[in-house]
Each structure stands twice: as structure tokens, then as C-alpha cells.
Amino acid sequence: MAKRIKTPADIGALVRIVRKEQNLRQDELAGVAGVGLRFIVDLEAGKPTAQIGKVLQVLQTLGCSIDILAPGERRK
């Protein structure tokens, strides 16, 4: 599922959707991702100041990846 991300809230919504698809509770995701429960709660709420390293850690744990396109590039 490719999803265009424009805001922290978009990332949070994606994390919530994928977490639920994997039948994980927030505390379970926090444990396997190596972050705190509060971080997952804040991330899913779209907190704009979430630490990028931890965000990437959570996304990787869920099996998600990020592709960043430079201006003028197109998706393949």
C-alpha cells in the first residue's frame, strides 16, 4: 500500500492502520520497536516533534519503508 505522506498526522495514521492490521496493541508495538508506549501514542496522534530516528525504527518494525522523491522525480 503506497501512501503519500504530507504531515506528521499522515505518518501517525499509517502507523495505526498497519499496527492494527498486524493485530498489535500499542504497548506491544512499543516493546518490539524498542520505544516507549508514550512515543507510540504520540506518534499515532501525529505529534510533529517526534524524533525521526524513533519514527524510522517503528516504521521498520512494522515492515514499512520510506521513499523520498527529489523534485521532478516520479514513482516507478
From Swiss-Prot:
**GO molecular function terms here?**
DNA binding
Report the residue ranges that make up the HTH cro/C1-type domain in this protein.
15-69
Q: Name one Pfam family in it.
A: HTH_3
Question: What UniProt keywords are attached to this protein's entry?
Answer: DNA-binding, Plasmid, Transcription, Transcription regulation
Q: Which InterPro entries match?
A: Cro/C1-type_HTH (IPR001387), Lambda_DNA-bd_dom_sf (IPR010982), Tscrpt_reg_HipB-like (IPR017507)
Q: Which SUPFAM superfamilies match?
A: lambda repressor-like DNA-binding domains
Name the DNA-binding stretches: 26-45
Do the record's keywords include DNA-binding? yes
Instruction: State what protein this is by name.
Output: Uncharacterized HTH-type transcriptional regulator y4mF
Which organism does this sequence originate in?
Sinorhizobium fredii (strain NBRC 101917 / NGR234)
